[in-house]
Amino acid sequence: LPADGVHGRWPDKPLEQELRLNKYKIYAAREFARVNGLNRIAIDSPNPRFGIITTGKAYLDVMQALEDMGITGSVAAEIGLRVYKVGMPWPLEPRATHEFAEGLEEILVVEEKRSIVEDQLTGQLYNYPVAARPRVIGEFDEIGRDLLPNLAELTPAMVALAIASR
């Protein structure tokens, strides 16, 4: 980190502030998330194939949807389900995200409003070898049909329907 810190301050020019953001602050924030375990696997399986990545209130909706569907931790392990709880959605810490995605065939991103996590996740997985890259769905499915709307509040029932469709 620079000796004078990373914070925005007067009379720094906007380009100097942007340089600090892109050269230091984003990497420091990602490392903070990694070291403090802000993003974590909440449910795991020994042979995962389907993952759900979620953040905020949507995490509670996912957990309620799974409970409503009768998917307990042992059932999740048996059917190959992995759930990843994101505590800090931006910037999305890539190392733990890659560990989560390892071995998955498909990832369902469940988040409300804007696609903050989904956009970062697809960017982080883009350079995976094609055979190892999981399909990412969320607001839309793999052929562009609406799956989880970003214009309405998600409910456990909506999330359950999205999960069941997979």
Positions of predicted regions on the chain:
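Flexible, low-complexity linker and terminal segments
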Residues: 1-166
